Amino acid sequence: MTTRRDDDLDRAAIWQDFVLAAHLLEVALERQSQRDGNISHGHFKLLVLLSAAENQTLGLKALAGMLRFSPSRVSHTLNVLERQDLVTRGRVPTGRRAYEATLTSQGRLLVARVLRAQRAEIRDVLFGSLGAADAAALGRISARVVRVLDEAEV
């Protein structure tokens, strides 16, 4: 019979493994983004969101929400990316006092190059080590983690 203490120890070990896995994945993505794109992974995530958006454009408020960044952090990130000609920023055409960011052609090329390297060096290696059932479980668990953290507004 499993005791409460054993359950707590099991959960603590699982938690430590999960935190380490998340950290190592972020380290690998950061290293790869720097090497193949000369860009931080935090900045790269913003470019990826723009690349997937309609007309490769998103409002700054939407970007902040998706990335869980403060408005000032989004603004700072966009300043850096604008200087590198990876994005442009302008007013929303509807006349509101809102702003939006658009991925440039240079930004699209960078996203394609870095994603190609990520796929080969990180994603395919990770999924190659998992069977179909484990990959599906990882997908379900990842979606649940996102949902729980979103609901908790952590």
Task: Give the residues covered by each predicted segment.
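Alpha-helical linker/hinge and terminal dimerization helices associated
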Residues: 25, 29-32, 67, 110, ...
